[in-house]
Amino acid sequence: MATNYIFVTGGVVSSLGKGIAAASLAAILEARGLNVTIMKLDPYINVDPGTMSPIQHGEVFVTVDGAETDLDLGHYERFIRTRMTSSNNFTTGRVYEDIIRRERKGEFLGATIQVIPHITNEIKRRVIEGSKGFDIAIIEIGGTVGDIESQPFLEAIRQLGTEIGRDHTLFMHLTLVPFLGAAGEVKTKPTQHSVKELRSIGIQPDVLVCRSDRSLPATERSKIALFTNVEERAVIGLRDVDSIYKIPSMLKAQSLDDIVTKRFNLDCPEADLHEWEEVLYQESNPNGEVTVGFVGKYVELPDAYKSVNEALAHAGLKNRLTVNIRYIDSQDLETKGTSKLEDVDAILVPGGFGDRGIEGKLIAAKYARENNIPYLGICLGMQVAMIEFARNVAGLTGANSTEFDENCSDPVVGLITEWMDASGQKELRDKHSDLGGTMRLGSQECHLEKGSKALKMYGKETIEERHRHRYEVNNHYIEPLEKAGLKITGYSHDKQLVEILENPKHRWFVAVQFHPEFTSTPRDGHPLFKGFIEAAGEFHKERLG
């Protein structure tokens, strides 16, 4: 069967939730037995988000094959079973880099390189290549219609709509329908102007998804349909909700999936959304709550830790607990003490880079260890747990990471200079290598030790998890640290790199070098996060007596 394409654009304002809407539609179509993928086309000039500030851009989501991508790909994986790869996200910078490299090699035979056709052709090529083998490919265009940065992408999808034909393409446009309190009514004019802007570049939307803080009245739906030349049944209202996992059923109730399948002439069964109904039931019927102290350096923007936040919520669903996250700037622990940790039920230290706030993370790890509070360390959170234990238990007072102090007397954490990438190829780097794309990235095998908490939670000796790091535990210090009571319970497939450490004397102290948050989903959860929140629930009961 030929691939069918749904192109998703946004108008009026940014951050309308195109990614959530696209993922929710994909979830319904997948529930109808269709093989679905989603792509995100980002209009910024960066080659990828790998070196962008998390405070500006949000988290970097890592795919199975090691691509550093937009956080929307995390939404995609949480809503559908398809695993994202490097083909599912590319930027203006990536496209231009490829075209310029090919021009320097002489591949264009001296032609003048232009946005049309060279840039648009490369965009089209990547869209087609990344969509092969799927029944439906949903293509989300980042930014807002009217932005100068988005023009090459919009022109490319306009051309694809013509070349592939209407029988296999559909354009879905998200807009904002604001409510004006002074007038006491919703206003459709911004949507009308947004569609007018889209039509001016040759794209007529087939579906409008109208975001609002309330239900869209039938009269306004008719008005929007009249002025935008969109069928009234294809004007979909999408009011604000308290859980993004309600959106698939909301879109299903308005027959958006039927509009899609009829457009593409697809004969498939009705959507079975019972898994999503179970998620919503778990979410709305908790048996208790826990508070997790989340000690990070980018906490002013929760989206910097989007997948961790979601993984904690998923673990709450599986344990029937509401997870309250208390964000704590690690620098505050350095300057204001540990009072914010005193009534938490668990402590989590996530990944990060650089030495700012590192002492605060060490304080958090020490507080969890000394007070027997469940602790989960991720990536840098594992490294600080190792450093803290080395300093305060193993007697290595000069312990540190060479990332923070190249001349420390006990470098228990150091730069990885050689490793295998996700495809099995050897990678080399040193401290002078570029920052972008030079980490140990992607899904890697990890072997779990018998008798460990990790093995009990995962239920199997070999697992695969995704990585994003340059620094690793120095193997020369494993023996003295294990003699002092720490236990290494997970190694890389070649036994060269430490993946998991545990403190057997502690009720629940587990730290991992990989990023388990990237594989957690609302339907399945994740073994580590489920175990962590279960331990938090038990600690909460004991704490309250």
UniProtKB/Swiss-Prot annotation:
Cited SUPFAM superfamilies:
Class I glutamine amidotransferase-like, P-loop containing nucleoside triphosphate hydrolases
Q: Which residues bind L-glutamine?
A: G352, L380, G381, M382, Q383, E403, R470
Q: Which residues form the active site?
A: C379 (nucleophile), H515, E517
Q: A single Gene Ontology molecular function, please?
A: ATP binding
Binding-site positions, UTP = S14, K187, T188, K189, P190, T191, Q192, K223
Q: Does the keyword Metal-binding apply?
A: yes
Q: In which pathway does it act?
A: Pyrimidine metabolism; CTP biosynthesis via de novo pathway; CTP from UDP: step 2/2
Q: Which reaction does it catalyse?
A: UTP + L-glutamine + ATP + H2O = CTP + L-glutamate + ADP + phosphate + 2 H(+); L-glutamine + H2O = L-glutamate + NH4(+); UTP + NH4(+) + ATP = CTP + ADP + phosphate + 2 H(+)
NCBIfam families documented for this protein: PRK05380.1, PyrG
The record, for HAMAP family, names: PyrG
- Which family is annotated? Belongs to the CTP synthase family.
What protein am I looking at? CTP synthase
Gene field = pyrG
